[in-house]
């Protein structure tokens, strides 16, 4: 599945909660290590999740992302690709719920 197919839903979700696409991009680039140009290139090329995360340099503080997403505890996810996808889902949820950006980006933890 292309990341772009899900990205549209991420944008809709955060904008419904009065957050911006720019904030969404900041969250995703923090997690993946991509700059916004590279992220947009992956979206335009319809890169699938496997290739998207294969190219990413996951932020070292991503391990601090905890909790549940879709009823599944992140710490219990064994598949590395699925864990990265759920990290991104969790960050988007936190953004949509109005959590401060410095907490979403695990600054000062």
Task: Locate each region found by the language model.
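A charge-rich, low-complexity, intrinsically flexible signal that marks solvent-exposed coils, linkers
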Residues: 1-109
């Amino acid at each position: 599945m292309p990341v772009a197919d899900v990205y549209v839903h991420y944008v809709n979700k955060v904008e419904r909660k009065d957050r911006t696409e720019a904030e969404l991009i900041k969250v995703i680039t923090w997690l993946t290590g991509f700059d916004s140009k590279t992220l947009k290139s992956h979206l335009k090329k319809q890169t699938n999740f496997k290739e998207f995360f294969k190219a990413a340099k996951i932020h070292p503080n991503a391990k601090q992302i905890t909790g549940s997403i879709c009823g599944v505890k992140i710490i219990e996810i064994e598949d590395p690709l699925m864990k990265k996808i759920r990290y991104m889902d969790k960050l988007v949820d936190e953004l949509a719920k109005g959590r401060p950006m410095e907490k979403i980006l695990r600054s000062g933890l």
